[in-house]
Amino acid sequence: AFCFPGYSAQGADLPPPKICAATWRAQMLARYPNLELQLLVGGYAQKWHLNTKASLGQVMAQWRRDLPAILPLPHPSWRNNAWLKKNLWFEADLLPELQRRVKELMR
């Protein structure tokens, strides 16, 4: 996969090398000047795109702030299952908004 660093000895995703974002993200985003929705999946993407040091929980708590152009999402990992169970608003509020926004853009 594009800039995927591989797995640790325990089978977890390794963090992306900083060179990936420095080398590719601005160049890739420039290819899509009419991009209407960016899904920031995981803390690394959120920190880079939002230029923040906030935790995943802090960023996710402010998910409405950058709508309709940006929507942060947790990394799809078993490690986030506990977070998802504690933050029921994610499934109740954020996911329906994501579905609505994608449908809107698909028209």
Where on the chain are the PLM-derived regions?
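Glycine/proline-rich loop-helix segments at beta-alpha junctions forming the active-site rim
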Residues: 1-107
